[in-house]
Regions:
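Nucleotide-sugar donor-binding/catalytic module of glycosyltransferases
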Residues: 1-149
Length: 149
């Protein structure tokens, strides 16, 4: 059976603090990644330098920079139009997420196991170096389009 292809999309804005760690965690996935597409929203820190460094080393990383700041929602909306038409799944990444190596493999396995799944997500585990709280099941299950938006 042929493996499903996965593209990762990430939007950035002044994300240099955790960006290297996140890029490394995506590259360390045990499941193959078809492409990584990053769209920067006019960062003023070293984000673009880091992204260009990774794109030079790994040709399947495509980096785009907006000509004007669009904001998070519009940036994510637009990035989906840059994904290759040949991929089966799109994984959404934030610039400060650090993924476990098996994340994509487990999500693909789950979505393939259950007929009719169109969306799959995972909880977060916070770290002492991050200010976020750990969340559990933040969407009611089963959820509907109305509960998502």
């Amino acid at each position: 059976m042929e493996k499903k292809t996965v593209s990762v999309v990430m939007c950035t804005y002044n994300g240099e603090k955790y960006l290297r760690e996140q890029m490394d965690s995506i590259l360390a996935q045990t499941y193959p990644i078809h492409e990584i597409i990053v769209c920067d929203d006019c960062s003023t820190d070293g984000t673009m330098n880091i992204l260009q460094e990774y794109a030079t080393k790994f040709p399947f990383i495509k980096v785009h920079r907006n000509t004007r700041n669009k904001g998070c929602n519009q940036n994510f909306h637009d990035i989906f139009y840059q994904v290759s038409k040949k991929v089966d799944y799109i994984a959404i990444s934030d610039q400060d997420d650090i993924w476990f190596p098996e994340k994509i493999g487990k999500l693909v396995q789950l979505i393939e196991k259950e007929e009719g799944y169109n969306l799959c997500f995972s909880d977060i585990i916070s770290s002492p170096t991050y200010s976020r709280q750990q969340t559990k099941d933040y969407l009611p299950l089963p959820f509907t389009a109305e509960s998502l938006f």
